């Protein structure tokens, strides 16, 4: 247990830091600090349809980033999803517009993200609350364009 706590402590920080901007990394920053997640990117219809279906275990600071070509209304469900998930619905500038916590595995009830969503970050259920992630926090990733609140190469203010 102690090694996991040490690793977690190194990955989540309240101090400003240079975020690593890579396709397989997402940094989430807010008043609580910041956390970097290793992610798989789902940026086409087939990958988005598959999502995290049939995944039975996911390391703590890992997730999936769903990327859309343009802002739109999105809705998710948990069909064939085996683990609880938190969903962060994100605007084109990287601002978290909605957080849905602890989506129920296998539940077919639609989970609406709202309008103007460009990306969705799925992480382990309950992790948003444990870290303090809320609406208004900001994501940093290379997929955000010139309108990004926190462009790649910029310091995150945790």
Protein language model annotation of sequence segments:
Residues 1-6:
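Bacterial N-terminal signal peptides that target proteins for export
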Residues 13-17:
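N-terminal signal peptide c-region/cleavage motif recognized by signal peptidases
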Residues 20-158:
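Compact, glycine-rich, soluble single-domain proteins
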